[in-house]
Amino acid sequence: MKIRLLSVLVAVTFTFLSNSIFADSIVATYTCKLKEGKKKEDVQAVNSKWLKYVNENVSKDIISSFGSAVVGNQDIFMFADTYPDLETWAKTQTALDSEAASEIDGMFEDVSHCSENRLWKLEPTK
């Protein structure tokens, strides 16, 4: 059930992200679980801070989406961070390794645990 749910979430995310405005995009996906006593709103608040940081310090073209389960385990969720190209993704990783961004990383660890991640290149079907 867990694998089916994850497959559905990934498929829905890719369908959404495969629009022409995301042609040849780089997408980082993270499969995560809420820590005990935390809510999705807690994670979304931290993710908003993360997005604001990368938009201000790297590129305004970075988009982050939060995927929650429609059915099944509501504690499992995913992030899909979309970058216009691999160079922007690499610049983001460098920016996130800075001391200024370490506080945001700690905030994620306080509310969630991410067990999987993947970096995808999306190409439109012709």
Q: What would you call each of these model-derived segments?
A:
Residues 34-37, 83:
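Structural beta->alpha junctions
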Residues 23-27, 33, 61-78, 101-126:
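Glycine-rich beta-strand-turn "strand-cap" elements at beta-sheet edges
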